[in-house]
């Protein structure tokens, strides 16, 4: 039995995610605790790099692709010449993501050439980011749950729709999947919008039966039959909804190998009771050890990332 901590649409709000995971009882040292992101981890918020560092450090984490992951993927793969890259920079918060990963303080008036230079720098400094994005699954299942960014088509399930539907659909976000006994958990469409559409269509809405933390108002998770919508509207609420789900995996996960981490690259700071992760660009986030309350300098830091804490002086 694993305990899954499920969230969606963080959009660079790292501190909101960290607060919610702490409140939900997430322990990164517990092999039975698994993070499940339903996508849209990046854009709009200012701390996309920290969100990536948290998610990519542990191969046990489940990171489902959302439409905003495709925005970053296109930018890294095709550069500023990508079909929608410039549009997403101007209108969908991709500029803030590039700024976060490139350690740059950019303005809206930045030149195209400068943006391309920053994209090139990200590909060089974070060379595992693009492969990580490209390998993201469109969905994840446990014994009793199905997780996806935007959802599935209730009229054809268990046949799965195409990728565009699973990344973008809002038409069926409020419709239960009557052909399945599983519970379907989705993001993408703000939870309060899903609730409005469901009630207008005559469905009964409730709060999820599982434990959850996050928004206590209309932006909190909403349950319609066997579907739970959890998009927290994070950039406005500065909160992230986290469901805590105990369930059996579909298959036995692969055993982790223990490799000695690389030497010493660890800087953790606590400013105004905010906790941040700062990792040198040369370190692959997959090699980072991530623990709670193990900072040598300040025990009040909730999350700490380091490569080899014994070598810190």
Descriptions of predicted regions:
Residues 48-137:
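Active-site neighborhood of divalent metal-dependent phosphoester bond hydrolases
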Residues 6, 35-37, 63-64, 146, ...:
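Residue-level marker for buried hydrophobic side chains located in beta-strands
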Residues 1-53, 58:
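N-terminal active-site segment of His-dependent metallophosphoesterases
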Residues 9, 40, 66-67, 97, ...:
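Divalent metal-coordination and catalytic microenvironments
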Residues 107-229, 233-238:
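Acidic, His/Gly-enriched loop-helix segments that form or flank divalent-metal centers
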Residues 263-308:
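Long, low-complexity intrinsically disordered regions enriched in small/polar
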Residues 1-8, 16, 20, 29, ...:
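Extended recognition/assembly regions associated with phosphoester-bond processing machinery
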Residues 11-12, 43, 69-70, 152, ...:
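Short, glycine/acidic-enriched loop or turn micro-motifs at the edges of active sites
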């Amino acid at each position: 039995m694993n305990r899954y901590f499920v969230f969606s649409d963080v959009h660079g709000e790292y501190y909101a995610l960290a607060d919610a995971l702490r409140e939900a009882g997430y322990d990164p040292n517990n092999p039975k605790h698994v993070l499940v992101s339903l996508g849209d981890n990046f854009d709009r918020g200012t701390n996309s790099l920290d969100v990536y560092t948290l998610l990519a450090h542990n191969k046990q984490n489940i990171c489902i692709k959302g439409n905003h992951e495709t925005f970053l993927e296109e930018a890294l793969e095709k550069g500023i010449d990508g079909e929608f890259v410039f549009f997403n920079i101007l209108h969908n918060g991709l500029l803030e993501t590039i700024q976060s990963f490139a350690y740059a303080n950019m303005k809206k008036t930045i030149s195209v050439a400068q943006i391309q230079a920053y994209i090139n720098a990200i590909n060089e400094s974070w060379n595992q980011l693009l492969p990580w994005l490209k390998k993201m699954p469109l969905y994840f299942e446990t014994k009793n749950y199905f997780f996806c960014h935007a959802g599935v088509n209730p009229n054809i399930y268990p046949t799965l729709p195409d990728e565009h539907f699973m990344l973008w659909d809002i038409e069926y976000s409020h419709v239960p999947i009557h052909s399945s006994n599983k519970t379907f958990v989705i993001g993408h469409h703000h939870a309060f919008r899903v609730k409005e559409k469901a009630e207008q269509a005559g469905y009964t809405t409730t709060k999820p039966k599982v434990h959850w933390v996050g928004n206590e108002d209309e932006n909190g998770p909403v349950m319609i039959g066997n579907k739970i919508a959890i998009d927290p509207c994070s950039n406005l609420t500065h909160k992230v909804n986290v469901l805590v789900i105990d369930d059996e995996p579909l298959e036995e996960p692969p055993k982790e190998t223990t490799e000695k981490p690389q030497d010493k690259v660890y800087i953790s700071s606590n400013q105004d009771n905010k906790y941040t992760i700062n990792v040198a660009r040369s370190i692959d986030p997959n090699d980072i050890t991530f623990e709670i309350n193990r900072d040598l300098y300040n025990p009040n830091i909730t999350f700490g990332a380091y490569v080899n804490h014994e070598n810190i002086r």
